[in-house]
């Protein structure tokens, strides 16, 4: 055990020996730090307010100067200074069992959770403080916090021990506050437009609704394999078949894929479905929703993301995949008249890497887009009219069966949303699922399975419907100016930590 931990453990024992708890049962908080700082900002330097408060938080700083001491504590809302006068603290020791000024000075460390009772005072230097009358130890910290000046410089440790990151990095705490507010805003925005929130299964007998490799688990009692959902799409569409015309789900999605600054195997999305709508309606909804979220969170429709200015107020570009590929690469896919080999050679000439999976004109077009165009789309851009081969759940285009009524929204070179005019023809859907199943049988683990129950639902009849999915984590990255998706997920998945450190055991039943 480290010397610091042993010393702090001894202080906890000392508290118990004096008849005080080192880990309290509860504490009644009357006000948050932010409320006090706002409510009593009017006080003049040196002025006191006859207002009793009880506040709790973690000790972040400690300064003892003879018979007075200053502490800084932090709660969820902010920080406030505590002012301790030895005479006041020790005034009622004979009447009540309280911690003395000497106890506080000797036993309390940075990192401890404490609760105080007192009144409000603004110091002569102008800092609003709590003039402490009584002090309670709420939880004794046994390990020191990271140095407050250098913070938590090990980025991986910030993700692995998020609790430390939140303590020493106010920006991280603000990121997760913003995340919570954005999610709440989106829910209210949809609720106010009469969308109904639905909860669909996380454990599914078939993983469908996206091209992705699922996580597999097993149900012991039923003795069947189950999959963690890779999308909420197919179950939400079943709800539309059942008569719910406007539905959505905000929830966790699981995809057994790689980890990067843009990808986490467990992430949050919102999927939205509206009967009697198409992908043009979904474009309008997407633009309106995201503009409203950005304005509410940032106070402006012009934001800075990683030194790039993003203007959400201007009309968002809508352009087909073929046209934007031609714009950025000079390759006109219409000019090949279906000659796949000629198109493939043109693509190789601009150094696009091709796998064996890229075996159709549509997949070739998509590969060029992903490798040569996507990263260049900084301002909000709707890329529309995708190849049918990569869009098995989308409605065919009006006059071209090789493409579908689909769009993806790109901002700062990243996909943020994906939407279709939904395919509601059960015969067409079965044919596409059969093709997907054949690809899966050939080894493509991301291809769709045939979902007979979903096909049965379509045969019952589904109205024309527009569907949309928005990646919440990537949206929060934009709003909070975060470079990595790991910065906006409280506990991202990380590689196993390689360590030889043995677990330290504390003495049992000594500290209460």
UniProtKB/Swiss-Prot annotation:
GO biological process: lysyl-tRNA aminoacylation
Residues that, per the record, bind Mg(2+) 2: 415
Matches recorded under InterPro entries: Aa-tRNA-synt_II, aa-tRNA-synth_II, aa-tRNA-synth_II/BPL/LPL, Lys-tRNA-ligase_II, Lys-tRNA-ligase_II_bac/euk, Lys-tRNA-ligase_II_N, Lys-tRNA-synth_II_C, NA-bd_OB-fold
SUPFAM superfamilies to which the protein is assigned, alphabetical: Class II aaRS and biotin synthetases, Nucleic acid-binding proteins
One Gene Ontology cellular component annotation held by this UniProt entry: cytosol
Catalytic activity: tRNA(Lys) + L-lysine + ATP = L-lysyl-tRNA(Lys) + AMP + diphosphate
Binding site for Mg(2+) 1: 408, 415
Quaternary structure and partners: Homodimer.
Protein name: Lysine--tRNA ligase
Protein species of origin: Prochlorococcus marinus (strain MIT 9215)
